[in-house]
Amino acid sequence: MLALTVAASASAHDVSSPAGHAAEDAVTLSAGGEQRLNQQTLDASKAPALVAAAATAGTPADIGQWGPVVDWPVVAINSALLPNGRVLAYDSVGDKATETFPGQTFTRATVWDPSGGGQTDVRLNLGYNIFCSGFAHLMDGSLFIAGGNKDQQLNGIVNTTYFNPDTNQWSGGPNMAAGRWYPTVTALDNGEQLITSGGPSTPEVRQNDGTLRSLSTASLGQPLYPWFDVAPNGRAFYSGPDPTLRGLDPSGTGSWQTYQQRDAINRDYGGHAFFDVGKELVAGGGPSTTSAAVIDVNGSSPTVDSTAPMAFGRRQHNLTVLADGTVLATGGNSSGAGAVDLNAGVYNAELWNPATGTWRTLAAMQITRQYHST
């Protein structure tokens, strides 16, 4: 893992075809049960042509600076910042390990303390595996996790799970109506959590009393890990990865409103981030496009404006909103081929400035970060 410091001037893991995504993830579960893609990492020195093309001159004050590479006990497929400043990360059984556990009975997890770099093993031992789950923070700072991986055929599980950051303890929640694999969980303004996709077309809501409510009149087939954020009107706003923009009213049994097309791109494995109230940046995805767009959902219907393209085409990258409102793009690959292309990793970070609508190329990382990065 590396840390990038940027001078001041915040799983994307999405596909439109569940069958296609299952085929890609099956690669990671074959030939020994649990061989993960982290065993196929490539450092920058092994891709000289791409690194040379991405070379960026400047001081750390201009282009940022990556810290040293350090080993972690897990591949952080999912990670969450906790109220105490520590970071929870978890992955599949067998990740970064020689042994295999095809029974899917636990999940490797760690809590990292950035102040000292220490790691605490907090593996989940509840008899199931939350690899390929979705999560959101509850108002008390704990995490609510939905779904996971049931078997070698990549079926989802019905389990929901809680993580208590004060005690580092896991506990089971209510079972969903159907198993979910790669769902999205979205924290709503009223403290509830919206669970979408992961296989089933009918969303569910975790209510504040801890029970689940089906949005039975809002069934709609969606991509795995759909992009949802909460709009100022309280609706869950859907922005991708496919181009049709929608709003989901999670009250009662639910209802959809369909808006216009965002653009003409299916941004599978793209990135999205709400960088301001009611304003969202989407960038990359699909055939590793460089294009980006800004969606404003503050009005009665969304508006879409183009913004400057990134310097590098990316998919499987991450967008992170920083404290000053800029958006950091890291990782991904530029080939648009399959789940991973180790010869097409994008090593340079880029920083998008909402005031100017432009990107600035930053320092290059040492190791490619693509599929299952966070």
Identify the residue ranges that each predicted region occupies.
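Secretory targeting and sorting signals
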Residues: 1-12
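Kelch-like beta-propeller repeat domains
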Residues: 12-374
